[in-house]
Amino acid sequence: MTRTQYGSLRAGGLNWDSMPLKLFAGGNAKFWDPAGIDFSRDRADWESLTERERDYATRLCAQFIAGEESVTQDIQPFMSAMRAEGRLGDEMYLTQFAFEEAKHTQVFRLWLDAVGVSEDLHGYLDDLPAYREIFFDRLPDALGMLAADPSPAAQVRASVTYNHVVEGMLALTGYFAWHKICVDRGILPGMQELVHRIGDDERRHMAWGTFTCRRHVAADDANWSVFEARMNELIPIALRLTEEGFELYGDDTPFGLSLDEFMQYSADKGMRRFGTISSARGRPLAEIDLDYSPLQLEDTFAAEDRQALAATA
């Protein structure tokens, strides 16, 4: 691709109020260093857990760290798609996005090292076929497709896969599990801080995905059908992954976690995204760039979680 001009040199400069650059500024303001989290108490808490509890927590962590590594690698074609559209603000934000995913991979590995988990963990994914379908096939395929086809429809399919299902359902449900494990028992303070830091980053990631889908739906209503179809295709797989994780432990799930509660939680997070995207239908495209409702949705989810967890404490 031949470079012909610079977005940062255009008359008027960059629109710092646009959604992508608001997210970029937010990430800069909330920078954190994985090496700065204190995991010193987590080792003793880890050793106090039963073998079955450690097995569950290790499997949960394996899913997270493999997922973070996956998205660190798979996000690259989205940057190229933004460049092809001439959207420098989005491209700037996605460089930060990729950096944050790499930090998330780092911090989960640091935690595993701190609690003494050093064996090969691939086996923890073998009993989760829905996980393998999403992370081994659906995610890399959808994002990899952008290298050859950066069209709006392909971007919507990729964003649904990554931002709305992987992050917006699976990751949020996983954070909910960590909160139930750690906060209810007052254990693993390092993991608690880790989840807080990552969750803050990923609220911005999910908001960008929602913004991107809204932008394309506002520009062409046909993209609403693309969004609907992809969500309806992937939500059942995401819910099946939650079921598979519980089925491995029978009727005695460690930490007293409830399948029904987690299925309801995950489904709620998926279904409520439809309304935010559909609200962009027929909207003037110029309004979408300055509409911060995608970030407000993620903040609402976070506030609801804090309230629910406080009620059970």
UniProtKB/Swiss-Prot annotation:
Keywords: Iron, Manganese, Metal-binding, Oxidoreductase. InterPro entries: Ferritin-like_SF, R2LOX, RNR-like, RNR_small_fam. There is a cross-link at V71-Y162 (3-(O4'-tyrosyl)-valine (Val-Tyr)). Its cofactor is Fe cation; Mn(2+). Binds 1 Fe cation per subunit. It comes from the Bacteria. Fe cation binds at E101, E167, E202, H205. GO terms for biological process: deoxyribonucleotide biosynthetic process. It is an enzyme of class 1 (oxidoreductase). Mn(2+) binds at E68, E101, H104. GO terms for molecular function: metal ion binding; oxidoreductase activity. Its EC number is 1.-.-.-. Gene3D superfamilies: Ribonucleotide Reductase, subunit A. Homodimer. Belongs to the ribonucleoside diphosphate reductase small chain family. R2-like ligand binding oxidase subfamily. Probable oxidase that might be involved in lipid metabolism. This is R2-like ligand binding oxidase. It comes from Mycobacteroides abscessus (strain ATCC 19977 / DSM 44196 / CCUG 20993 / CIP 104536 / JCM 13569 / NCTC 13031 / TMC 1543 / L948) (Mycobacterium abscessus).
